[in-house]
Structures are given as structure tokens and as C-alpha cells.
Swiss-Prot record:
Belongs to the GST superfamily. Theta family. Keywords: Cytoplasm, Transferase. This is Glutathione S-transferase theta-1. The keyword Cytoplasm applies. The lineage of its organism: Eukaryota, Metazoa, Chordata, Craniata, Vertebrata. It comes from Rattus norvegicus. The gene is Gstt1. GO terms for cellular component: cytoplasm; cytosol.
Length: 240
């Protein structure tokens, strides 16, 4: 049976899975679950992921719902090149270290930045208090600095001389604030050079394909009132 991936490329972890699968020629059937239409909240999608979140994966009768778990499953099952998730214990531990750190730090601040700058005011028509936006951008700056100083340092990639899962997860996170109009790479030459290396390692065409939605997100139309009412209870937690 064909591997099934339930994705919306608006979502940063969905983009990471999409890039990884495409780059490694992993055959899959993609089901687009449109977050801005509330399709992830449907009873039909709840049969795939009861938590009603993307990404999700079905491999025959086996389902998996967390992005890092899906990436590791694909890396193990399809025997991808070693640099993605190295066999070397310490190199693998560095990938794991980044994946463990980013979930409540860089991912959170990148997500909040996009929502505070674009999704709430443009898509949902809800204004964010200036002091809240300022705090969000300050938090983003702190986490980007940690990424640069603690993880990237002076290496070509986050874990060494070759691209890994850590780099794909990190770059897809950073493209969220980029899509929201934040110049996160300006004034950061090491990070900007890393960005160019990741884009080249992935392939520019695939990189742009995966990020087409997020790079056009500021042009999204306002939400339908019914959709807005459906989405608001879940997304309000992002501005607390």
C-alpha cells in the first residue's frame, strides 16, 4: 500500500516532512488538509488523527501523528543516506538534541510571529496589541540567536558538514517569520550562509515548491465568518 501523508504546506512541520520525503524519493500519496478551511477539525480527519492536527501519516493500517516521529519513521523505514540521521551515536544525539529543543522554543516563537503579524490581523481580522507583538519578536530574536550560537556555531550545517533532519526542521520553522515579513537572516551572515547551503542541499526548486504557500501568506483573503468561528477557540491559545 502507498504511504499516505496528510499535510498542509502552510504548516512548518508539514513542509519538513514534504521536503524530506521528496528529496529522498520516498513514494507517497499526499492528502492536503487545508487548515484555513478548518478541514483538520472535521470528523473525517479525526479518524486519521484524533488530535485533529497535521501532519499525519498512514502506512497501511499504521497511523502516526507527530512530525518528529514521522520523520524518524521515514528515515528508518526507507534507509535514507546516513547524514540525515547518522548512525554515529554522538552525531545522532546532536540531531536528537536539536529536535528536542526546537519544539517549545524556536517553533513556538516562529509560529506566534506568523500569527501575530499576519494570520490574526489579515486572516482573522483580529488586531494584536503592539506590546504583545513586540514581546513575540523579542522572543523570536532570542531563539534565533540560540540557534546560531549554540547549534550552528561555525559549522556548515547544524550537526556537521552535511545536511540532517535538524537542518530541514530548522529552516522550515524560520520560513514562517520570513513569510510574515520578518527579515530573520538580515544582519546574521552565518545564518544567511547556512540558509543558502540548506537550500542548495535540498535543491532550490523543491525548496521553493515547499514554501510557495508560506511566502504568499500575506496575500491570503480574510476567513469566512463560519470558519473564523470554528478556528478561534483553537488559535486563541497562540496569543496568550
Amino acid at each position: 500500500m502507498v504511504l499516505e501523508l496528510y499535510l498542509d504546506l502552510l504548516s512548518q512541520p508539514c513542509r519538513a516532512i514534504y521536503i524530506f520525503a521528496k528529496k529522498n524519493n520516498i513514494p507517497f500519496q499526499m492528502h492536503t488538509v487545508e487548515l484555513r478551511k478548518g478541514e483538520h477539525l472535521s470528523d473525517a480527519f479525526a479518524q486519521v488523527n484524533p488530535m485533529k492536527k497535521v501532519p499525519a501519516m498512514k502506512d497501511g493500517g499504521f497511523t502516526l501523528c507527530e512530525s518528529v516521529a514521522i520523520l524518524l519513521y521515514l528515515a528508518h523505514k526507507y534507509k535514507v543516506p546516513d547524514h540525515w540521521y547518522p548512525q554515529d551515536l554522538q552525531a545522532r544525539a546532536r540531531v536528537d538534541e536539536y529536535l528536542a529543543w526546537q519544539h517549545t522554543t524556536l517553533r513556538r516563537s516562529c509560529l506566534r510571529t506568523l500569527w501575530h503579524k499576519v494570520m490574526f490581523p489579515v486572516f482573522l481580522g483580529e488586531q494584536i496589541r503592539p506590546e504583545m507583538l513586540a514581546a513575540t519578536l523579542a522572543d523570536l530574536d532570542v531563539n534565533v540567536q540560540v540557534l546560531e550560537d549554540q547549534f550552528l556555531q561555525d559549522k556548515d550545517f547544524l550537526v556537521g558538514p552535511h545536511i540532517s533532519l535538524a537542518d530541514v526542521v530548522a529552516i522550515t520553522e524560520l520560513m514562517h517569520p520570513v513569510g510574515g515579513g520578518c527579515p530573520v537572516f538580515e544582519g546574521r551572515p552565518r545564518l544567511a550562509a547556512w540558509y543558502r547551503r540548506v537550500e542548495a542541499a535540498v535543491g532550490k526548486d523543491l525548496f521553493l515548491e515547499a514554501h510557495e504557500v508560506i511566502l504568499k501568506v500575506r496575500d491570503c483573503p480574510p476567513a469566512d465568518p463560519v470558519i473564523k468561528q470554528k478556528l478561534m477557540p483553537r488559535v486563541l491559545t497562540m496569543i496568550q
